[in-house]
């Protein structure tokens, strides 16, 4: 992917890595995000450029969790990945476990920041093995140093109008 970032599908065997490579093992399932798409590479490049150790990151439309996990391995202090698709959230959680990333550093939730046109609010959901239920209406209770959204332009455009409350004063909004 990059000289020092390797995305390894669970079904492949790595043969050529360096000791300082960041290796992310992933099983995308039906969720978007294997790391090979050009837009994903653009977002990774911007994360490498702007992320500082200890930064907080909000991955909106996290898909398989690939950008969340890379941000964590690049030194983010905490990463929150959110997706509107319950299956994507489950895939992200499984991929984080596969890469030995604990919930103290990386968390995933199901939600929609554009729900009901509430600026700065969204709906999150609690997931269990058999049901999905609305848990709370999410107020902006945390700001992030970086918000990354590798999703369709049709979503990024309206999202850009509501993302400001989630960013710290000098935060970055990375989109592709």
Name every feature range the model reports, one short phrase each.
Residues 20-28:
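A short, charged helix-loop
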Residues 1-17:
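N-terminal auxiliary segments of SAM/dcSAM-dependent transferases
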Residues 84-176:
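S-adenosylmethionine
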Residues 14, 33, 154:
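Active-site beta-alpha loop architecture of Rossmann-like, nucleotide-cofactor-dependent enzymes
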């Amino acid at each position: 992917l990059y000289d020092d970032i390797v995305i390894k599908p669970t079904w492949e065997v790595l043969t050529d890595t360096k000791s300082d490579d960041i290796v992310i093992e992933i099983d995308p399932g039906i969720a978007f995000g294997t790391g090979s798409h050009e837009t994903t590479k653009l977002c990774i490049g911007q994360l490498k450029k702007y992320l500082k150790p200890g930064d907080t990151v909000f991955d909106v439309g996290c898909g398989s969790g690939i950008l969340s996990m890379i941000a964590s391995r690049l030194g983010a202090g905490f990463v929150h990945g959110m997706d509107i698709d319950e299956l994507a959230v489950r895939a992200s959680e499984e991929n984080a476990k596969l890469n030995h990333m604990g919930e103290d550093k990386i968390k995933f939730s199901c939600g929609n920041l554009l729900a009901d046109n509430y600026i700065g609010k969204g709906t999150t959901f609690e997931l269990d093995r058999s049901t999905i239920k609305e848990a709370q209406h999410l107020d902006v209770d945390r700001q992030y140093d970086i918000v990354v959204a590798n999703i369709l332009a049709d979503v990024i455009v309206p999202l850009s109008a509501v993302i400001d409350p989630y960013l710290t004063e000098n935060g970055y909004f990375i989109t592709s």
